[in-house]
Design a protein with these regions (language model features):
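Conserved helicase ATPase core of P-loop NTP-dependent helicases/translocases
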Residues: 282, 305-310, 327, 465-469, ...
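Conserved interdomain linker/interface between the two RecA-like ATPase lobes of SF2 helicase motors
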Residues: 387-455
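Conserved segment of the helicase C-terminal RecA-like domain
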Residues: 532-537, 541-571
């Protein structure tokens, strides 16, 4: 029986007969739902990436749903993979524009069935040796694929299986009777669709007219969940007699309404709202009018170059006008009970400071989307470090506050075989070929709504002007705007875009902030990402909700830029500087919540990987910058847990560059109190051995011994009674770690004196460590490291045999988890058989300069099979090899760990257990002529798609 057939048999047995069998089959039937950890969309994308052809039979398709697959479908087209989509016009649900989007898919043939009540939802994928299908309740819509509660099942069958034959036959039968999708059919359908739409619109308008008066009288704006939480926080700050607070909120998340709701709650005698832009000022005043009780219009006034409504209860002022001495000093310093600084990151500027320092309101609120931007005074210090609420991009999308988006990281234009890079000459950036390429990409990925209203961000003014000319010459109405243009001219151009009189505004950084164009339905980035903050600001230009769009399309042209690594940092909002996090983000189709999606064309994704591999994210300057940002937020020296709580750099990045955090602080003169050499070395031990949180028992044993000395039996009984899922061996290993007997001789040179001492009866803290505890500074660092250990341990909590699939481990970690007496780092050379365990550590891409005796060519044969080499100078008759070939009979378990390349350091992805495939062993030779044995190993569980792609690409 072939391995594939055997796997199918066991998978079906587990899925349909006995759920208790241990087989983790690659083809086990699986229920697909949308929840926090998995989405139906992910399975469909994974199947598309592996298939040789595909067939969709689905009744309802939306533009947004189709957009979530476009990057993958384009990659398939480039590989020559074709597919078919069968749909219909059932109930008039599908829009004519969506059908037009289907026609753009060059590798997909689309037909329409007129069968009555067509309500199918099936996705079929043909692979080399088998077929799979997703059948259930999900249409090809964003909500069905990512958000709604759906029931679908993933089924796999052999090529000759009856089920796939029946499904495919039914599809073929309908296909033959269906009508090919054409422009002519779409035009015909459009007429009837628009007629029905007008009828529906008339009904809606009539209903709205009947209800208008009642609604107008009864409507009161109430806070959403996030605003309600922020309002409670603001009240709590005032209840503590604090007079300043800061709201950090992504663009478009309703900061102004939130502020108005708080003002309504406080009901000040006089209120002042300060902003830098008159356009924003007028919109803010109108927002406040919606929320606050209006007695008469004179309650609301403006203080600008043209208006002087200084007696208004609610005064809205531009900083340019207010900051003049004769303007702000006409008011008493206590004139306003409540003052708001919009775009508060500007408050450090001298114009703002004059106003900020003059007025003494009962309460002052700062609002900003980017508090980190100031290069002058600390915004956090200005508002007394009182952060009332913070909502960033991911959370805002999850809460449906922002307009959903589909982000596409696309491959930039290649000029005569040379990809765009940091030094590309302007003439190539605006060449006819590149402009045509831009038009092709923006057309393929499309937009939501009836007309295109787009912002394009470029690198220079000249590029903006040249590109606008080129696009306009091709019939695409485009205007370049720069800082050289007057405010009045900018506003005229913006209004033209809003009204659909032009399609593109092209700029450099004019619209990074302070400009509100809700109608924008496509944002194009034609410049390298050099700042994650600016990236989010530019993306945010399209995220304000508007009636003209359901989503915004974001197209990022990714060239051969050194700073591409900033893209996953920006999109994920993850400031940890942890490369693994960013690589996982790139490969995870569920990386963002709601109906929004993040998609990369294959070549563009590789460009980002290359940038991530090349950049050093643990540079001293990056660590120092992260430190200063957190210090700036808190107003004092942060501890390691502060970096976690402030969503900043991962402490492990600090440890990769400095022996301990104290060493970093001393290096940059951030601490006055000095530790002894032994105390500092002890902190190195805790930073490397306890803080990673590999085994919770380590920190628990330490905490217990910090209280008092114990006998071994007392400690053992206490731990076994109070801690779940530990053994006496776990306790013994923890003690060996703490008394350093786990390590090789000479470890004291690195870690200082052992932490504990023990004899046949008692376990106690060592004298040196007891002396260290008398130092308050040492104690502070120790407690921080113990808390960090507990926090980090959460990711290791659910592991079988102490190991979790796809977590990363070192050889030393394995030694600890399996309670070896000694650290195996120096003796596990590729693999080692010890007791009943055989860890195998594989570096997939080896440096070309390694010796011929270690140039093993281990490789994946598939997602669940691996060609593996023993150590050199081994033959089929070697005792070690014979032991490996009979590992099942001897009860020896193989554990597979793989890293992509040596540059990944000491850590390897755990891919699960495996077994030797009988008959696959072979005597072979290394490049230097020495003997070696090769064999195929079968993983008990196929490697997850994203990890497999990362390791093998």
């Amino acid at each position: 029986m072939s391995r594939l057939l055997n796997d199918f048999n066991q998978s079906l047995h587990k899925g349909f007969i006995d759920k208790h069998i241990s087989h983790k089959g690659n083809y086990t039937p699986k229920l697909l739902v949308n929840n926090k950890n998995e989405k139906v969309l992910s399975t469909i994308i994974d199947e598309l990436q592996k298939c040789e052809t595909f067939y969709f039979s689905v009744a309802f398709i939306t533009e947004s749903g189709l957009a979530s697959l476009k990057a993958q479908l384009l990659d398939l087209s480039n590989k020559g993979v074709k597919g078919k989509i069968l749909t219909s016009n059932y109930l008039g649900f599908n829009s004519p524009k969506m059908y037009g989007e289907l026609l753009k898919l060059k590798n997909v043939e689309v037909r329409l069935t007129d069968i009555a009540g067509f309500h199918a939802k099936g996705y079929i994928f043909e692979h080399k040796d088998y077929s799979s299908m997703v059948i259930g309740s999900s249409n090809l819509t964003s909500n069905a694929l990512k958000v709604n509660y759906e029931h679908n099942v993933l089924l796999s069958t052999m090529k000759n299986g009856d089920l796939v034959d029946s499904v495919k036959s039914e599809f073929d039968l309908l296909w033959q009777k269906s009508t090919p999708l054409t422009e002519q059919w779409i035009n015909s359908y459009k007429e009837s669709f628009e007629y029905r739409s007008l009828e529906k619109l008339a009904e809606v308008e009539q209903t709205q007219m009947l209800l208008a008066d009642k609604v107008k009288k009864s409507v009161e704006i109430v806070p959403n969940l996030m605003q309600a939480e922020a309002l409670r926080s603001l009240k709590a700050i005032r209840d503590k007699a604090k007079d300043k607070a800061l709201i950090i909120s992504a663009t478009g998340t309703g900061k102004t309404i939130l502020c108005a709701l708080d003002v309504r709650e406080v009901n000040p005698n006089k209120f002042l709202f300060i902003v830098h832009n008159e356009g924003i000022l007028n919109r803010a005043k109108e927002e406040f009018k919606k929320v606050l009780p209006i007695k008469n219009d004179s309650d609301f006034g403006l203080l600008t170059g043209k208006h002087r409504d200084v007696d208004a209860k609610y005064l809205f002022a531009t900083i340019q006008t207010l900051s003049r001495d004769d303007n702000f000093k006409q008011f008493d310093e206590n004139e306003f009970d409540y003052i708001v600084f919009d775009e508060a990151h500007r408050s450090a500027a001298s114009t703002y400071q004059r106003v900020f320092n003059y007025f003494k309101p009962k309460f002052m609120l700062g609002m900003t989307a980017t508090p980190e931007r100031s290069d002058e005074l600390s915004i956090f210090e200005l508002f007394d470090y009182n952060i009332a609420y913070e909502i960033r991009l991911q959370a805002a999308l999850e809460s449906d506050i922002l307009c959903p988006f589909h982000y596409f990281g696309v491959t930039d234009y290649v000029h005569q075989g040379i990809k765009e890079d940091d030094v590309t000459k302007l003439r190539y950036l605006t060449s006819d070929e590149r402009v045509n390429y831009i038009i092709q990409k923006t057309d393929y990925y499309g937009y939501s709504g009836e007309i295109l209203q787009e912002l394009i961000f470029v690198s220079s003014k000249k590029e903006a002007y040249d590109l606008a000319d080129k696009l306009s010459s091709k019939g695409i109405k485009s205007v370049a705007l720069t800082g050289d243009d007057s405010v009045n001219y900018r506003q005229i151009v913006i209004e033209k875009l809003k009204e659909g009189k032009i399609n593109y505004i092209i700029t450099v950084d004019l619209f990074n902030e302070g400009i509100d164009i809700p109608e924008v339905n496509q944002v194009v980035m034609l410049r390298p990402t050099e700042s994650s903050i600016i990236f989010i600001q530019q993306l945010g230009r399209g995220l304000r909700k508007s009636s003209n769009k359901e989503y915004v399309t974001v197209i990022d042209f990714i060239g051969n830029y050194k700073t591409n690594y900033l893209i996953p940092i920006a999109l994920s909002g993850d400031q940890s500087q942890n490369k693994d996090n960013y690589k996982k983000f790139l490969t995870n189709n569920d990386s963002i919540n709601g109906v929004s999606t993040i998609n990369f064309e294959e070549v563009a994704k590789k460009q980002i990987y290359n940038s991530l591999d090349a950049v050093s994210l643990n540079q001293n300057k990056l660590i120092l910058k992260a430190y200063e940002e957190v210090e700036n937020r808190l107003g004092h020296m942060p501890l390691l847990m502060d970096f976690i709580q402030q969503h900043s750099i991962d402490p492990s990045v600090i440890f990769s560059k400095f022996s301990n955090y104290y060493e970093f602080l001393v290096r940059y003169k951030k601490i006055d109190t000095l530790l002894t050499e032994n105390e500092s070395k002890n902190l190195v031990f805790f930073s490397r051995q306890i803080a990673p949180g590999l085994k919770r028992i380590d920190s628990l044993v330490l905490e217990e011994l910090l209280k008092n000395e114990l006998t071994y039996d007392e400690l053992k009984n206490k731990m076994l009674n109070e801690v779940k899922d530990i053994t006496e061996d776990d306790i013994d290993t923890s003690l060996r770690i703490l008394d350093f007997s786990f390590y090789n001789a000479g470890i004291e040179k690195i870690y200082g004196s052992p932490i504990i001492e023990r004899n046949e009866r008692m376990i106690r803290l060592s004298d040196a460590f007891t002396n260290a505890l008398s130092n308050q500074t040492f104690n502070m660092f120790l407690e921080d490291l113990i808390e960090l250990s507990k926090y980090n341990n959460e990711k290791y909590q659910k592991g079988k045999n102490g190991l979790i699939l796809y977590n990363k481990y070192s050889r030393e970690d394995f030694s600890k988890i399996f309670n070896w007496n000694k650290n195996g780092s120096s003796v596990i050379m590729g693999y080692m058989i010890k007791s009943q365990e055989m860890p195998i550590f594989i570096t997939y891409d080896k440096h070309e300069d390694i010796s011929d005796s270690t140039k093993y060519e281990d490789e994946f044969l598939s997602q669940d099979e691996l060609k593996w080499f023993t150590k050199s100078n081994r033959t089929l008759e070697s005792k070690e090899v014979q032991k490996i070939l009979s590992h099942r009979a001897k009860g020896i378990k193989m554990y597979i760990f793989v890293q992509k390349k040596d540059d990944d350091g000491i850590y390897f992805y755990y891919l699960g257990t495996a077994g030797y495939i009988e008959g696959s062993e072979k005597q072979d030779k290394m490049p230097n002529g020495s003997n070696v044995v090769t064999m195929d190993l079968a993983l008990d569980k196929a490697v997850r798609d994203d990890i497999y792609r990362y390791l093998t690409n």
